[in-house]
Design a protein with these regions (language model features):
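Intracellular loop-helix junctions on the cytosolic face of multi-pass helical membrane proteins
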Residues: 1-132, 157-165, 302-311
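Loop-to-transmembrane helix entry
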Residues: 37-40, 120, 126-148, 166-175, ...
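Transmembrane alpha-helices of Major Facilitator/SLC transporters
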Residues: 57-61, 134-163, 175-187, 265
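Hydrophobic/aromatic residues within the transmembrane alpha-helices of Major Facilitator Superfamily
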Residues: 107-111, 144, 182, 189, ...
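C-terminal transmembrane helical hairpin of 12-TM major facilitator-type secondary transporters
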Residues: 171-234
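Intracellular juxtamembrane helix-capping segments at the cytosolic ends
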Residues: 232-246
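A late C-terminal transmembrane helix in Major Facilitator Superfamily
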Residues: 243-276
Length: 311
C-alpha cells in the first residue's frame, strides 16, 4: 500500500470501511477480499455447470415431445419461366427491404437498451444510493427478470393467439419500443423532480449534499423491469422475424445482419455518457425516450406493409 497514490489509497480505505472492514491492517483486509472474490468466482462456475447439466437432463427427458425433424429432400433441377423468375426476384427484394427496415429500427433499440452498460451504470454509481445492495446483485437484475418474465409474456402471447387475437411480430416490436421509452420517460420525470444537474456538476457538490439527494435503489429496479420487458418483446421476436422473412438461400446471412444491427447500435453508445456528463440528467433520458418513441412511430407506420410481406 505504500506505493499507492494518496487518492487511490483513500478510495481503498473508503471501500473497506463501507464494506464493514478494518483499515488498521490493509493487508489483512485485501487478503479477505481476494479470498471472498475467488470463492465467488468458483461458485459462479459451479452454478453455470449445474444449470447446463439440468438443461441437458431436460433435453433428454423431453426428447420424445420434440417435433420430428424435416427430412432432407433431394435437390431437383427445376426450370422457371421468365415471368416466374421476375416474380420471385420481386418477392425477394420485398423481403429484404422489410428486413432492412426492421434492422434499422432495432439499431436504435440496442442503442437505448445497452445504455445499461454505459450511462445507466454511471447513473447507478453517481445518483443512486446502492449501499444496501451489493454490486453483484445489480448484475443479476436483468437476467432474473428475463427468466421470471419470459414464461409470463409467452403465456400472454399464446393466450391471445388461441383467442384469434395474435399480435404480429412487427406490432410486438413497436410495443417493445414503447415499453423501452416508458423506462426512460420514468427516469426523465424522476430526475426532473429531483432537480439533478449534469453528472459533472453533481460531482462538484459536497459529499453530504450528494448523499442526501441520491435516489433509492428501487428506481433502478423499476427501470430495468421495463427495459427487460422491452427486450423480451424485441430481441427473440425480432430474430424470429428475420427467420420468417429472409429468403431461404440467405437465412444465415440475414441472421448475421441482425447481429450487425446490434453492433451498430453498440457503436452509438458513446453518445449516452456524452449527454450524461454535459446535460441535466433528465434531458439525457428524454433523448432516449424520444428515440424510442420515434422508432415506435416509424414501426407502426410500416406495420401493414411488414405484415403483408411476412404472409
Amino acid at each position: 500500500t505504500a506505493t499507492k497514490a494518496p487518492e487511490a489509497l483513500a478510495n481503498l480505505q473508503q471501500l473497506i470501511t463501507s464494506a464493514g472492514g478494518s483499515i488498521a491492517d490493509l493487508t489483512v483486509s485485501c487478503a479477505q477480499y481476494l479470498q471472498i472474490f475467488n470463492e465467488g468466482i468458483h461458485y459462479s462456475f459451479i452454478a453455470s455447470v449445474a444449470a447446463m447439466l439440468i438443461s441437458l437432463i431436460i433435453f433428454f427427458v423431453s426428447q420424445k415431445t420434440f417435433p420430428t425433424p424435416a427430412k432432407k429432400i433431394a435437390a431437383q433441377n427445376v426450370s422457371y419461366t421468365p415471368e416466374e423468375k421476375a416474380a420471385m426476384a420481386k418477392e425477394i427484394k420485398q423481403r429484404m427491404y422489410a428486413l432492412f427496415a426492421v434492422l434499422g429500427i432495432v439499431i436504435f433499440f440496442w442503442f437505448s437498451f445497452h445504455q445499461n452498460g454505459m450511462s445507466l451504470s454511471f447513473f447507478a454509481r453517481d445518483f443512486v444510493d446502492s449501499s444496501a445492495v451489493a454490486p453483484e446483485v445489480w448484475q443479476a437484475i436483468n437476467p432474473f427478470f428475463v427468466i421470471a418474465l419470459t414464461p409470463v409474456i409467452m403465456a400472454i402471447f399464446g393466450g391471445l393467439a388461441k383467442r384469434g387475437k395474435e399480435i404480429s411480430t412487427p406490432r410486438k416490436i413497436a410495443i417493445g419500443m414503447f415499453i423501452a421509452g416508458t423506462a426512460f420517460l420514468f427516469l426523465a420525470v424522476f430526475s426532473l423532480i429531483k432537480g439533478y444537474p449534469s453528472a459533472n456538476d453533481f460531482k462538484l457538490l459536497p459529499i453530504a449534499e450528494q448523499m442526501a439527494n441520491k435516489a433509492h435503489w428501487w428506481v433502478l429496479i423499476a427501470t430495468y423491469f421495463f427495459l427487460t420487458v422491452a427486450e423480451l418483446f424485441i430481441s427473440p421476436l425480432g430474430l424470429s422475424f428475420v427467420s420468417k422473412v429472409a429468403p431461404k438461400s440467405m437465412l444465415g446471412l440475414c441472421q448475421g445482419l441482425w447481429l450487425a444491427a446490434t453492433a451498430l447500435g453498440n457503436l452509438l453508445l458513446w453518445i449516452g455518457p456524452l449527454m450524461y456528463n454535459a446535460w441535466p440528467i433528465w434531458q439525457c433520458w428524454t433523448v432516449f425516450f424520444i428515440v424510442c418513441l420515434v422508432s415506435m412511430g416509424v414501426m407502426l407506420g410500416m406495420v401493414k406493409w411488414l405484415e403483408r410481406v411476412t404472409k
